[in-house]
């Protein structure tokens, strides 16, 4: 059985780790390089840096953060935010990233994903999907989700399931799936959406948005069918450590690397 991955996510703004609720009201949570080092030492499987302002602000600082992190951290590093061209990807890979996460630029020009996969390999390409529920069935269960871009501010009218399918066919190596309804709420992942997209594609799906306790990670893997789970504030503010979370998952019969 493939071990499930635990991935701390570092939302970075102007070179600092921040964590907000639904992308607003940001609170400074520290230095990204120090945080990354701590997670590496604790046994995180991977790290994700999201430059949450790069899509509509400056981005040069991020390269420096990636370079300094890669010098000290030896687990796979994914970088997203403001990745718009193959040159952006190349620069991040040269700085020390292992994968690049593409979001708004893929929506704007889906061919970019195909071009990136052809040039760098699917293993370097992650498509980030930020989605909100837009339709419920008569029992109130979520049944349809739409893609939003620009930090959740811009609706696109694109169906999330169809988009995930299309991005897989274009060569994406994995999907980073964030529920904009759940992000920062600490109420757990959007399990119906996670399960629907995990079932719709054959590439790995990383669940994101809404973790408040280890039980939510377990639900994302078990009910959501995710291959990996991503969380931010529960780790940044030391509510739980990576070893605590991994022991909890192992005790609940989830295969993890200890």
UniProtKB/Swiss-Prot annotation:
One of its GO terms (cellular component) is cytoplasm. NCBIfam families: hisF. InterPro entries: Aldolase_TIM, His_biosynth, HisF, IGPS_HisA/HisF, RibuloseP-bd_barrel. It holds the Pfam family His_biosynth. Pathway: Amino-acid biosynthesis; L-histidine biosynthesis; L-histidine from 5-phospho-alpha-D-ribose 1-diphosphate: step 5/9. Its main location: cytoplasm. This is Imidazole glycerol phosphate synthase subunit HisF. It is an enzyme of class 4 (lyase). Its EC number is 4.3.2.10. Heterodimer of HisH and HisF. The active site is at 11, 130. Belongs to the HisA/HisF family. HAMAP family: HisF (MF_01013). GO terms for molecular function: imidazoleglycerol-phosphate synthase activity; lyase activity. IGPS catalyzes the conversion of PRFAR and glutamine to IGP, AICAR and glutamate. The HisF subunit catalyzes the cyclization activity that produces IGP and AICAR from PRFAR using the ammonia provided by the HisH subunit. It is found in: Cytoplasm. GO terms for biological process: L-histidine biosynthetic process. Keywords: Amino-acid biosynthesis, Cytoplasm, Histidine biosynthesis, Lyase. It catalyses: 5-[(5-phospho-1-deoxy-D-ribulos-1-ylimino)methylamino]-1-(5-phospho-beta-D-ribosyl)imidazole-4-carboxamide + L-glutamine = D-erythro-1-(imidazol-4-yl)glycerol 3-phosphate + 5-amino-1-(5-phospho-beta-D-ribosyl)imidazole-4-carboxamide + L-glutamate + H(+). Coiled coil: none annotated.
